[in-house]
Amino acid sequence: MTVPQMIYLLSDATGETAEKIVNAVLTQFRDKPVRLRRISNVRNRPAALEGLQEAIKNQGMVVYTVVNRELAQYIKDECEVRGLMAFDLVTPLLSQFSQFFGRTPGQTPGLLHDMDEEYFRRIEAVEFTVKHDDGQEVSHLRHADIVLVGVSRTSKTPLSTYLAHHGWKVANVPLVLGIDPPKELFQIDPKRVVGLYIDSQRLVELRVARLKHLGQDPRAAYADIEEIEEELRYAKLLFRKQRWVSVNVSGKALEETANEVLVKLNLK
């Protein structure tokens, strides 16, 4: 059995960024068995030396992401003295940026990790929102940051998607006249629920356009003004009864509606 070659990732934060970059490069060497060993929070010489000694023991390569120039230089010097192959992922780029911006860089460790955390938080929010669109998986409503409720064509899905891309886990539940909403909707904190409504005439226009797009008769009950007004009365009554905050989406851009939702839920 072939023994995998070791690559040590020394980082002043978690090492996630270095690991992603190294793994991307390793896709070009799929025939080589490799093992990555992350050594996090390397912010002083003793911590760096401890990682290097392990690399020496296993004849590994060292890849490091350290923003402190003195510590990065120390790692470089020690690797040269000890015969370790090493690569600095950060210093060359910092130097180029310094020339480009005409100023010296800050040396705050962990900022790349903070960016990664924010990125993955948004990805997780989008994945959650897609799975909980249009009344899907209502058993998980309690895990949502925001639950949007409204009759058909009140911008529930696009608004959910917009909020998700800003890091909020959103579920949306349609209200249909004559059909009871899922019981799970009444079991969650009402302070996380927002009722969406729209002007009746505007809703007629949206539904007629939808029916035409689907090749269906635009005179169907779905787009009937009396039917729509009854649906909206039912929805608004439910909002008041459950003490859910409500937002009129008529004539508003998604950004404006999203901001209003966050303000009314005290999330902004």
From Swiss-Prot:
Pfam families with a match to the protein in the record: Kinase-PPPase (PF03618)
Reaction(s) catalysed by this chain's protein: N(tele)-phospho-L-histidyl/L-threonyl-[pyruvate, phosphate dikinase] + ADP = N(tele)-phospho-L-histidyl/O-phospho-L-threonyl-[pyruvate, phosphate dikinase] + AMP + H(+); N(tele)-phospho-L-histidyl/O-phospho-L-threonyl-[pyruvate, phosphate dikinase] + phosphate + H(+) = N(tele)-phospho-L-histidyl/L-threonyl-[pyruvate, phosphate dikinase] + diphosphate
UniProt entry keywords in alphabetical sequence: Kinase, Nucleotide-binding, Serine/threonine-protein kinase, Transferase
Domain of life: Bacteria
InterPro entries: Kinase-pyrophosphorylase (IPR005177), PPDK_reg (IPR026565)
Residue numbers binding ADP: 150-157
Coiled coil: none
GO MF term list: ADP binding; ATP binding; phosphotransferase activity, phosphate group as acceptor; protein serine/threonine kinase activity
Presence of the UniProt keyword Kinase in the record: yes
EC number annotated for this UniProt entry: 2.7.11.32, 2.7.4.27
PANTHER family: PYRUVATE, PHOSPHATE DIKINASE REGULATORY PROTEIN 1, CHLOROPLASTIC
HAMAP family: PDRP
Family to which the UniProt record says this protein belongs: Belongs to the pyruvate, phosphate/water dikinase regulatory protein family. PDRP subfamily.
Role noted for this protein: Bifunctional serine/threonine kinase and phosphorylase involved in the regulation of the pyruvate, phosphate dikinase (PPDK) by catalyzing its phosphorylation/dephosphorylation.
Descriptive protein name: Putative pyruvate, phosphate dikinase regulatory protein
